[in-house]
């Protein structure tokens, strides 16, 4: 999957945190669906509480909890810092990252 650093940089600087997280989750889902079309990524939000990202095929298999501050700090850190944080946590939980054509994974790993 290909990704545009210019567009992502613009989003990181100009979109509110929750919308940016939703964009990142959608990008992660698109990448996962290149490996298996049944992957789904869900972001649950509740004001004042951490964000919960659940990734599943048929049943939930990976969960990533991020505070609003973690999301905001990584959004400010760089256009792909939040993606990197999520992918690294997925690897810690046992997800195997597959080779894919395109530059997205090169940006985040």
Annotated model-derived regions:
Residues 1-43, 75-88, 92:
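Negatively charged, low-complexity tracts enriched in Asp/Glu with abundant Ser/Thr
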Residues 3, 60-72, 100-109:
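Polar/charged, Gly/Pro-rich intrinsically disordered segments
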Residues 29-66:
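Amphipathic alpha-helical interaction modules
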Residues 57-88, 95:
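Intrinsically disordered, low-complexity regulatory segments enriched in Ser/Thr/Pro
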Residues 84-109:
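A short, charged
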């Amino acid at each position: 999957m290909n990704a545009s650093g210019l567009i992502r940089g613009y989003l990181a600087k100009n979109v509110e945190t929750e919308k940016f997280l939703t964009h990142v989750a959608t990008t992660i889902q698109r990448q996962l669906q290149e490996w298996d079309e049944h992957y789904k990524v869900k972001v649950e939000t509740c004001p004042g509480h951490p964000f919960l990202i659940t990734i599943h095929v048929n049943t939930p298999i990976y969960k990533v909890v991020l505070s609003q501050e973690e999301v905001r700090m990584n959004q400010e850190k760089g256009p792909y810092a939040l993606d990197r944080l999520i992918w690294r946590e997925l690897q810690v939980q046992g997800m195997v990252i597959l080779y894919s054509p395109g530059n997205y994974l090169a940006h985040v790993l």
